[in-house]
Amino acid sequence: MANIITRRSILGAGVGMAALAAGGETLAQSQVRGDASVAAPRLPIENGATLRILRPVRFVQPDEEVFRASAARFSQQTGVQVRVDFVGWEDINQQTAVTANTGAGPDCIIGFGDSPHIYADKLVEVSDIAEYLGKKYGGWMFVGEKLGKRHGTNNWIGLPFGGTAGPLVWRKSAVKEVGYDAPPSDLPGFLEMCKRLRRANKPSGFALGNAVGDGNGFANWLMWSHGASITNESGAVSVNSPQTLAALNYQKELYPTFVDGGTISWGDISNNQAYAANTCWVTSNGVSLYFALKNDPATRAIAEDTEHSVMPLGVANSWPSAPLTLNAMVFKHSRFPNAAKAFLTYMMEQEQYEPWLNANLGYWAHPLNAYRASAVWTSDPKITLFRDSMNNQFWNGYKGPISEASGQANAEYVLVQMFASVAAGQATPDAAMREAERRARRIFRRG
């Protein structure tokens, strides 16, 4: 869907402007404090500048309304015509690739995490605006800096906009029924809880299908909580390790405790459906599942019985989860790079960003420290945990550099299929690990 914004169309923004106005009222009581003494970079907007912006579709309606309204206000203040296209999540990577490889299309894409690293040579450096925003708003959180900077440099090639993590989602009543106040934070204890839930006919379930978010997220958690990784710090393939073998053996014990029929065919919405249907009582998911349950009278009772907590750490020092991150890029083919950078800066200033963050109900978490004080994080105690999603110390391709190869390994579900083959009884843990190593070596040699 597209939206052309001009000076004349400002008044047609409708509900979006109303949403932004409501956000402005919230700002009057905001606890977010930016440093007004930090000087903004000088970005003289090019004569006759127009912009086309591409980003993923909304999670909740106010996301789009507030985003469009803020873009409209940018047009009003600068005279720059802005077109905003919202495209499906499954299409954003493909459209990013086409734009980068053809040198034509949107001036700016707010894509997903590793895209700027894949197409770094096609992008305008954005260090000036990233450093300004960091200084003004308390510094960048770990994932924001990790995904924003080109590996091994201080040069910013992306501008992280927000991220969403997938913690443990669980039913209080079921967990209490099997003897716990909350899921154990250690791996043996968590396995024992899942066994008890299975015996109580209230099983857990985690995706082992080719699911972009949930499948990769679960496989990564299994790896990282055991100290395993697909590559080491230098980027060499490291999947063949005692730690990976331990993760596979753990999953071999865990999988029989899952829902009837198993989860090898689960996609990204399968666990949502099973949880809402009372066939799965513990899973992992973003905040979307909770709000979908809360907003439907038929499932509101499930939402009231739902809690979130960090997945068991195992040997990790922090939550072993890599947030799915929105990461903005400005392309070299744009005739108006200053206008594009000015737009992104404007959208991340408090007057625009905080209402947008609050409107997303916790689905997207901020990458700048000052926004920890935003009202959304205390609006419902069940979502406060998501506030620090962008400070998780993990990323896709951990422990190595973010690269085209690390993105490809994720896209080809190398780790997911390794665990799934053991769960299905198609391979022993050792054989599955060696096959994953073979695939990873092919990908990282090519990358």
Regions found by a protein language model. Name each.
Residues 36-39, 140, 306-310, 358-414, ...:
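Long, aromatic- and glycine/proline-rich binding clefts that accommodate carbohydrate-like moieties
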Residues 37, 43-46, 81-82, 176, ...:
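Conserved C-terminal helix/tail region of periplasmic/extracytoplasmic solute-binding proteins
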Residues 1-18:
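N-terminal secretory signal peptides and thylakoid transit peptides that target proteins
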Residues 194-196, 234-265, 311:
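Glycine-centered hinge/linker elements that transmit conformational signals in sensory
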